[in-house]
Amino acid sequence: MAGCVVGEPASAPGQRVTLLAIDGGGIRGLIPGTILAFLEARLQELDGPDARLADYFDCIAGTSTGGLITAMLAAPGDHGRPLFAASDINRFYLDNGPRIFPQKRCGMAAAMAALTRPRYNGKYLQGKIRKMLGETRVRDTLTNVVIPTFDVRLLQPTIFSTYDAKSMPLKNALLSDICISTSAAPTYLPAHCFQTTDDATGKVREFDLIDGGVAANNPTMVAMTQITKKIMVKDKEELYPVKPSDCGKFLVLSLGTGSTSDQGMYTARQCSRWGIVRWLRNKGMAPIIDIFMAASSDLVDIHAAVMFQSLHSDGDYLRIQDNTLHGDAATVDAATRDNMRALVGIGERMLAQRVSRVNVETGRYVEVPGAGSNADALRGFARQLSEERRARLGRRNACGGGGEGEPSGVACKR
């Protein structure tokens, strides 16, 4: 269970950049959903029942199912507050998972269909997302968001962010289109095409997108890059008090959706006999897709861990991940009642497990001697977030601003 001790802050409160990043993983979004509900509850203990995660993070980033969670946490709902509380996330998956991923009978006809079209038609998911997010565009979010996708026409990642949407009208897409796109995992859900228009110039841009997990299943570094770009251009709306190279002032929470890396998924002997069909479908899994996404997540974690360790800022990077999944829990689409309950249970057990961190030499996760549980680390993280927010609000009030519940990242708050 990957993590890192949250220790003494490297910077004074009110001088940090706070980031939440959530991996992709289909129905396994129940795992980070459980952890986020715990974190928000700790923030509510500190700052009152109206506290929401969007009040504390300068940026929330998510890929695939993590992008959907990002939208839930950052999209505006009633009275300008977030559409979802963190405690509502799992209810969304439990209520809608079986209809997003309907469990079909196996057989020759189903096997042949899987070779010629996506396993799911995506209509229920698309309709649910459109109803939930309506006409909200990415620049409308209550705090900055970063959601990776991949453009199959251009063969390159397309990153949607609140940062870009404010200055690039053609990137100011409907949040619903972005969420549908980042969730379009190859072989599981259909690719998504849409257009945006710049009303001032009449220019139109077309996007042909699939799941961002093929490029950045763990969006931590993508989000840090987006923030660093804003720092470099000295954006007046997002005047962060750091230098582009100063990762020591970032406070990062990165949540995985689980993996099988400690269990040993495949062997070279097995793979050496596979052709196209087996790489695309094997015992209910899509090995080539799973491998790409697992590699993306783990490499980003190792990169981030090395970066923070080199700056003696280990305590500013908290990664929580479970590498022991097996069976249905390891799939992205096993939306049975039993498996969904099991995934919630995995999230709850992760909270109780000891903090661990990646060994940058082996890529394996090891417990940190003398550290507490992941729940203890999140309590410490919540205290730092609360102190950061209070310092910003105090500074904002001192310079004539105001307003509880406003997003982070505004110059006056610094």
Swiss-Prot record:
The keyword ATP-binding does not apply. Gene3D superfamilies: Cytosolic phospholipase A2 catalytic domain (3.40.1090.10). GO terms for molecular function: monoacylglycerol lipase activity; phospholipase activity. A motif (DGA/G) lies at residues 211-213. Coiled coil: none annotated. Possesses non-specific lipolytic acyl hydrolase (LAH) activity. Hydrolyzes phospholipids as well as galactolipids. May play a role in disease resistance. This is Patatin-like protein 1.
